[in-house]
Amino acid sequence: MELTIFQVDAFADSPFQGNPAAVCPLDAWLDDERLQAIAEENNLSETAFVVGRDGDYRLRWFTPQVEVDLCGHATLATAWVLIHKLDDASPVLRFATRSGELSVRREGDSLAMDFPAKRPEPCATPDGLLEALGIAEAEVLKTDDYLVVVDDEKTIAALAPDFARLKGLPCRGVAVTARSQRFDFVSRWFGPNVGVNEDPVTGSAHTSLAPYWAQRLGKTRLSAEQGGARKGRLECDVRGERVVISGKAALYMSGTLHL
């Protein structure tokens, strides 16, 4: 069996930026063990598998270790492949996923993804969280991630987490965020529980980050940058119970899987 595969840098306008994702279009689903094996072999933070045509698709995402419920950057990468490599001219691409229906539309030279908003709630700071991050004091909130809000964006740039300690926490991942001089906010995201120590640009985390900062800053349109050494940029628009997350993407390579 031969399958075409693409590697796309999401939330970037050229290669070597943003967050790389593999995209594998399928005529029909392979068994779950084979999908997981492909994702493990790719060894990227996410591999997306997509089935469908003409604007109507089913989409699944796998890290090297597990299938996940939502992945923003791999959704962006998938939409880019469908539009630019598989010639889908539909004005809106719709994806049936484990998180419900998601849609992506073109907005100029960007792609806009419509996701359910997740509003973080204040919570008690779990034992070991701040110590694992090397942070003395922070505001802590929770959705499926812990959101750790610090006062200075320089703190985020200097983070060197203890991933073994983070892995024991009861969450999908940990997003650390702060106000920024160049953007409305910046962040980094760590997910050793799903096999990704640090994800360069995490679209799904912004379904929580954007509502938090929208409320705090009193605005619904927000600019964001995420990442440590490798960074990407996002535009977020909080619309009630939805968040529209926009960004660009760039093809890095394409090839053939021999299974």
From Swiss-Prot:
Coiled coil spans: none
Major enzyme class: isomerase
Gene3D superfamilies to which the protein is assigned, alphabetical: Diaminopimelate Epimerase, Chain A, domain 1 (3.10.310.10)
InterPro entries (UniProt xref): Phenazine_PhzF-like
One term of GO molecular function: isomerase activity
Active site: 46
Superkingdom per UniProt: Bacteria
EC number: 5.1.-.-
Gene Ontology, cellular component aspect: cytoplasm
Keyword Lipid metabolism: no
Keyword Isomerase listed: yes
Entries under Pfam families matching the protein: PhzC-PhzF (PF02567)
Biological process terms in GO annotation: biosynthetic process
Keywords on record: Isomerase
SUPFAM superfamilies tied to this protein: Diaminopimelate epimerase-like (SSF54506)
Protein family: Belongs to the PhzF family.
PANTHER family noted in UniProt: PHENAZINE BIOSYNTHESIS PROTEIN (PTHR13774), PHENAZINE BIOSYNTHESIS-LIKE DOMAIN-CONTAINING PROTEIN (PTHR13774:SF17)
Name used for this protein in its record: Uncharacterized isomerase PA2770
